[in-house]
Amino acid sequence: KWAFDIGGNGWGNNEKQFYTNADTANAIVKNGMLSIIARKERREKKEYTSARLITKGKAAWKYGRIEISAKLPPGRGLWPAAWMLCNNIETVPWPECGEIDIMEHVGYKKDSVFGTVHTGAYNHIKGTQKGKDIFIENPYTQFHTFAIEWTPEKIDFLLDEKLYNHFANEHKTSAEWPFDSPFYLLLNLAVGGNLGGQKGIDNSVFPATYQIDYVRVYQKD
């Protein structure tokens, strides 16, 4: 159900990596576990390589519980994420299409993860995004469960079953709530960028591995 986003265009965030296409140096499944590996190597004018896996065109979901079990890579400049974008992003541009960040982590904030929504009304360009962070213990040595519970009324963000961000449907317009259509999943490890690179990049941390044990989607019949 996974494909690859490919390239080194900065991805709207001034990211420093080039995302490769199904290169086992950057994405490999072993013993049922996915590893996304960022490396310090030059590729098409970028100084780093990594991978970004997407279910776009293969699978998308509307509502449900989406859960990822992962172990995060340590290091300043790293920016692992598990997130969702609307299937209609080709016709409805970001941020109007909506974005759900199930988990983001930046290496210079070792003990925090973030859960955020972006919409036309609420996004980081305006500084109005609806995000919160939560303390995380041992993110680099233990697997943790990152989840959202998404209904027509709300999106809840959970770390190891602990609720830390609640985004309610205010029943205004799609600018506030574009979350009534299918979204696809993305898993990536970025290097640098507007969020990940705020404190620079520590080149001693490469290669860096973001390990994903599973991704599960639960939906009511």
Identify the function of each model-found stretch.
Residues 1-221:
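GH16 jelly-roll
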